[in-house]
């Protein structure tokens, strides 16, 4: 998703 620094399960 737009956030690349968060874990993959947090990527929406």
From Swiss-Prot:
Q: In which tissues is it expressed?
A: Expressed by the venom duct.
Q: Which UniProt keywords apply?
A: Amidation, G-protein coupled receptor impairing toxin, Neurotoxin, Secreted, Toxin
User: Where does it live in the cell?
Assistant: Secreted
Phenylalanine amide: residues carrying this PTM = 12
GO molecular function term, any single one: toxin activity
Keyword Isomerase on entry? no
Superkingdom of this protein's organism: Eukaryota
What GO CC annotations are associated with the protein? extracellular region
**Role played:** This peptide activates mouse sensory neuron-specific G-protein coupled receptors MRGPRX1, but not human receptors. In vivo, causes hyperactivity in mice when injected intracranially.
Provide the family line: Belongs to the FARP (FMRFamide related peptide) family.
Note, other? The mature peptide does not contain cysteine residue.
Stated name of the protein: Conorfamide-Sr1
């Amino acid at each position: 998703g737009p956030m690349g620094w968060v874990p993959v399960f947090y990527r929406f």
